[in-house]
Regions:
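Alpha-helical transmembrane segments
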Residues: 14-17
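Bacterial N-terminal signal peptides that target proteins for export
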Residues: 2-11
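C-terminal motif of bacterial Sec signal peptides marking the signal peptidase cleavage site
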Residues: 19-22
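Gly/Pro-enriched, hydrophobic low-complexity segments
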Residues: 106-188
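Bacterial signal peptide processing site
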Residues: 24-27
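Post-signal peptide N-terminal segment of mature Sec-exported envelope proteins
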Residues: 31-54
Length: 188
């Protein structure tokens, strides 16, 4: 009799708990973005450029040899891959950067002792908190090579106007290769 009364008391409690947990939405683990959401911002820009294509006046310099072209169709994901991959909002990076930001300016600097390719990221924001300019410094060194890159993007009204990548790479047993790329989005 004692056990039966305990079961009768326990059954409604267990039923209530089961219903309460069954009716809640599954917890979605969304990582809070600690840094400026560069990847998602650029992907939004790419979507807009795919809807409203723009030509690009592109200047490329490789070891002093210059080439200038106007390109009408461009794969923006590939073109801006270095910028997109520079996004700092990755779970492994959450404690790797000092946040030196102030109002209207985002500045992230790699902490001493960390070994990640993005060393600094500076983002100047306009009055509406959209990027006005982005500057990224990257470098990597290993047994075979050393590489340094500076990436820049300039914006007008939150839309990309120009972008540039300049850098050099030196293989351990070779001479350094220097390169520059400047892209200017042309209005129709």
């Amino acid at each position: 009799m004692y056990i039966q009364s305990r079961v009768r008391l326990l059954l409604p409690i267990l039923s209530f708990l089961w219903i309460a947990t069954a009716c809640t939405d599954e917890a979605v683990h969304v990582q809070k973005e600690l840094y400026f959401p560069l990847r998602s911002y650029l992907q939004q820009e790419i979507v807009q450029l795919e809807k409203h294509p723009q030509s690009v006046h592109k200047t490329m310099i490789l070891d002093g040899k210059k080439e200038v072209r106007t390109i009408k169709e461009i794969d923006w994901e590939k073109e801006w891959a270095l910028f997109i991959d520079s996004d700092l909002n990755k779970p492994a990076f959450d404690k790797s950067y000092d946040n030196l930001s102030e109002e209207g300016f985002r500045w992230y600097s790699l902490k001493i002792g960390e070994k990640l390719p993005v060393k600094k990221m500076k983002i100047q924001l306009d009055a509406l908190e959209r990027p006005a300019s982005i500057e990224i410094e990257m470098s990597q060194t290993n047994f075979l090579f050393e590489t340094k890159k500076k990436l820049h993007m300039n914006f007008v009204d939150g839309k990309i106007e120009t972008y540039s990548i300049e850098g050099w790479q030196k293989m351990r047993w070779g001479s350094p290769t220097q390169y520059q790329l400047l892209g200017v989005l042309l209005t129709k």
